[in-house]
């Protein structure tokens, strides 16, 4: 009997390089309910057709490599490969296309945002056939989203914990963000909470530096919270930043926060990483802590319009990984188009079911089923004159965060907090009475300032400030 010289896998195998579109461009493919769908903005190199560029993205982010390999015969590529099933031209842009790619669910580990991103965007962005590449949106199928815990608690549970309903929540980032001692930091926290804010916040880069170690900060902030709660009769919180150099240290800080009895901790989810974030979210659910998420580093990824990843993808990923709040920009003063895009991903954070709407940047219908929602946080350069617009745009399920708009009050931190609380209560009351906040906003603030010297002073200071 002659020895076997040819394996079954090698039958029909032909070495060499072949066009990606022969295997990975499948315009007749009908997407499945279980597929993860991606919309990529593709800018091909000169001479590369959009179908080949889209197929290259599908290949390199799933089963493909640069050459044909004989081990392809050991598996079913048709079952596991990503498929570029449609391309379309981006209106008004030269040589830009949207390539739609479908990925079989079996390519992804359950409950791992880390693995999902490693597959879809991990290796393909440096591809030579592409001049630029941007991931615009993802459709997460129910069969995959159900493998994630999602936010530790969600919007309704947070309201029940805080016993606060029918209005946006108010926050303030303590400034200067770096340099204060723990005791002075705690003093600022107390003054803001005592004045009427619901939350104060560590800034994203407040971790455990020589001038203020984390344990000292946690202790003085907890003292401030309890003192303010006793004086106001309201539940208060401070976002204690648990972000650290290792997951073990991060969890240690969260454990200490829980032992102090505070309601909420914080994490920088992009610099900390999705694995760390998901670990912290699981700990927070198990131990009754709310989790505030800061998006530090997001602009490195999402600022370029033709390369990187849109923030709506990072927002969806955060909802899966876990967080009860996330920063979402302010909208105020931006162009109308930017407003619609921002409200698009705000809905993706809060709502259970979001219809496809290209005018708002939503490429796919998204059904989150029962996954809890995330509260968007409006923060950055806002003050009392913006309160009517913010209340109208973001609605009740939001946190409006005034850093300089609180601490910059000429009379001090507590009067700054009073001014913001009075402005918010006036806007909510006016809205509930049927008044138009967009049209009558300035008048509503002026009327309220007659009864609040703190608000009147704030109105005077910031009357000339515009975006």
Swiss-Prot record:
<feature type="modified residue" description="N6,N6,N6-trimethyllysine">
    <location>
        <position position="14"/>
    </location>
</feature>
<dbReference type="GO" id="GO:0000287">
    <property type="term" value="F:magnesium ion binding"/>
</dbReference>
<feature type="binding site">
    <location>
        <position position="379"/>
    </location>
    <ligand>
        <name>substrate</name>
    </ligand>
</feature>
<keyword id="KW-0601">Photorespiration</keyword>
<keyword id="KW-0113">Calvin cycle</keyword>
<dbReference type="GO" id="GO:0019253">
    <property type="term" value="P:reductive pentose-phosphate cycle"/>
</dbReference>
<dbReference type="GO" id="GO:0009507">
    <property type="term" value="C:chloroplast"/>
</dbReference>
<dbReference type="InterPro" id="IPR033966">
    <property type="entry name" value="RuBisCO"/>
</dbReference>
<feature type="active site" description="Proton acceptor">
    <location>
        <position position="294"/>
    </location>
</feature>
<keyword id="KW-1015">Disulfide bond</keyword>
<keyword id="KW-0503">Monooxygenase</keyword>
<keyword id="KW-0120">Carbon dioxide fixation</keyword>
<keyword id="KW-0560">Oxidoreductase</keyword>
<feature type="binding site">
    <location>
        <position position="177"/>
    </location>
    <ligand>
        <name>substrate</name>
    </ligand>
</feature>
<feature type="site" description="Transition state stabilizer">
    <location>
        <position position="334"/>
    </location>
</feature>
<keyword id="KW-0602">Photosynthesis</keyword>
<keyword id="KW-0460">Magnesium</keyword>
<dbReference type="InterPro" id="IPR000685">
    <property type="entry name" value="RuBisCO_lsu_C"/>
</dbReference>
<feature type="modified residue" description="N6-carboxylysine">
    <location>
        <position position="201"/>
    </location>
</feature>
<feature type="binding site">
    <location>
        <position position="204"/>
    </location>
    <ligand>
        <name>Mg(2+)</name>
    </ligand>
</feature>
<protein>
    <recommendedName>
        <fullName>Ribulose bisphosphate carboxylase large chain</fullName>
        <ecNumber>4.1.1.39</ecNumber>
    </recommendedName>
</protein>
<dbReference type="Pfam" id="PF00016">
    <property type="entry name" value="RuBisCO_large"/>
</dbReference>
<feature type="propeptide">
    <location>
        <begin position="1"/>
        <end position="2"/>
    </location>
</feature>
<keyword id="KW-0488">Methylation</keyword>
<comment type="subunit">
    <text>Heterohexadecamer of 8 large chains and 8 small chains; disulfide-linked. The disulfide link is formed within the large subunit homodimers.</text>
</comment>
<feature type="binding site" description="in homodimeric partner">
    <location>
        <position position="123"/>
    </location>
    <ligand>
        <name>substrate</name>
    </ligand>
</feature>
<dbReference type="InterPro" id="IPR017443">
    <property type="entry name" value="RuBisCO_lsu_fd_N"/>
</dbReference>
<feature type="binding site">
    <location>
        <position position="203"/>
    </location>
    <ligand>
        <name>Mg(2+)</name>
    </ligand>
</feature>
<keyword id="KW-0007">Acetylation</keyword>
<feature type="active site" description="Proton acceptor">
    <location>
        <position position="175"/>
    </location>
</feature>
<dbReference type="GO" id="GO:0004497">
    <property type="term" value="F:monooxygenase activity"/>
</dbReference>
<dbReference type="Pfam" id="PF02788">
    <property type="entry name" value="RuBisCO_large_N"/>
</dbReference>
<feature type="binding site">
    <location>
        <position position="173"/>
    </location>
    <ligand>
        <name>substrate</name>
    </ligand>
</feature>
<dbReference type="InterPro" id="IPR020878">
    <property type="entry name" value="RuBisCo_large_chain_AS"/>
</dbReference>
<dbReference type="GO" id="GO:0016984">
    <property type="term" value="F:ribulose-bisphosphate carboxylase activity"/>
</dbReference>
<dbReference type="GO" id="GO:0009853">
    <property type="term" value="P:photorespiration"/>
</dbReference>
<feature type="modified residue" description="N-acetylproline">
    <location>
        <position position="3"/>
    </location>
</feature>
<feature type="binding site">
    <location>
        <position position="295"/>
    </location>
    <ligand>
        <name>substrate</name>
    </ligand>
</feature>
<feature type="binding site">
    <location>
        <position position="327"/>
    </location>
    <ligand>
        <name>substrate</name>
    </ligand>
</feature>
<feature type="binding site" description="via carbamate group">
    <location>
        <position position="201"/>
    </location>
    <ligand>
        <name>Mg(2+)</name>
    </ligand>
</feature>
<comment type="function">
    <text>RuBisCO catalyzes two reactions: the carboxylation of D-ribulose 1,5-bisphosphate, the primary event in carbon dioxide fixation, as well as the oxidative fragmentation of the pentose substrate in the photorespiration process. Both reactions occur simultaneously and in competition at the same active site.</text>
</comment>
<keyword id="KW-0150">Chloroplast</keyword>
């Amino acid at each position: 009997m002659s020895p076997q010289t040819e394996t079954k896998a090698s039958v029909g195998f032909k070495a060499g390089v072949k066009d990606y579109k022969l295997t990975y461009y499948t315009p007749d493919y009908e997407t499945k309910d279980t597929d993860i769908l991606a919309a990529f903005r593709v800018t091909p190199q000169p001479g590369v057709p959009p179908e080949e560029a889209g197929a290259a993205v599908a290949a390199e982010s799933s089963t493909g490599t640069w050459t044909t390999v004989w081990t392809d015969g050991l598996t079913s590529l048709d079952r596991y490969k990503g498929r570029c099933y449609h391309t379309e031209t981006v209106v008004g842009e030269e040589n830009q296309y949207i390539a739609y790619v479908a990925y079989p669910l079996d390519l992804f580990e359950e409950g791992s945002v880390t693995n999902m991103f490693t597959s879809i965007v991990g290796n393909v962005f440096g591809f030579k056939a592409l001049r630029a590449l941007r991931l615009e949106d993802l459709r997460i199928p129910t069969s995959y989203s159900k493998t994630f815990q999602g936010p530790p608690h969600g919007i309704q549970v947070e309201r029940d914990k805080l016993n606060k309903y029918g209005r946006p929540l108010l926050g303030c980032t303590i400034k200067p963000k770096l340099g204060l001692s723990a005791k002075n930091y705690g003093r600022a926290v107390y003054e803001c909470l005592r004045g009427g804010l619901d939350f104060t916040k560590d800034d994203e880069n407040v971790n455990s530096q020589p001038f203020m170690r984390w344990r000292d900060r946690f202790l003085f902030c907890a003292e401030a919270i309890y003192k303010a709660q006793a004086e106001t009769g309201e539940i208060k919180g401070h976002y204690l930043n648990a972000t650290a150099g290792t997951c073990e240290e991060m969890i240690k800080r969260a454990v200490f926060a829980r032992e102090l009895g505070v309601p909420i901790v914080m994490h920088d989810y992009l610099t900390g990483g999705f694995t760390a974030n998901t670990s912290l979210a699981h700990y927070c659910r198990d131990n009754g802590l709310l989790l505030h998420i800061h998006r530090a580093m997001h602009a490195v990824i999402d600022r370029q319009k033709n390369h990187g990843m849109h923030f709506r993808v990072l927002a969806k990923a955060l909802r899966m990984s876990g967080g009860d709040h996330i920063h979402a920009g302010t909208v105020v003063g931006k162009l109308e188009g930017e407003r619609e895009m921002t409200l698009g991903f705000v809905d993706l954070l809060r709502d259970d079911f979001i219809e496809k709407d290209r005018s708002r940047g939503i490429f796919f219908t998204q059904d989150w089923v029962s996954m809890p929602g995330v509260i968007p946080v409006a923060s950055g350069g806002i003050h009392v004159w913006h309160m009517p617009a913010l209340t109208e745009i973001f609605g009740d399920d939001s946190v409006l965060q005034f850093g300089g708009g609180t601490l910059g009050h000429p009379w001090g931190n507590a009067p700054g907090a009073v001014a913001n609380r009075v402005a918010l209560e006036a806007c909510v009351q006016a809205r509930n009475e049927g008044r138009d906040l967009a049209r009558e906003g300035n008048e509503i603030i002026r009327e309220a300032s007659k009864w609040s010297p703190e608000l009147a002073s704030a109105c005077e200071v910031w009357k000339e400030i515009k975006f």
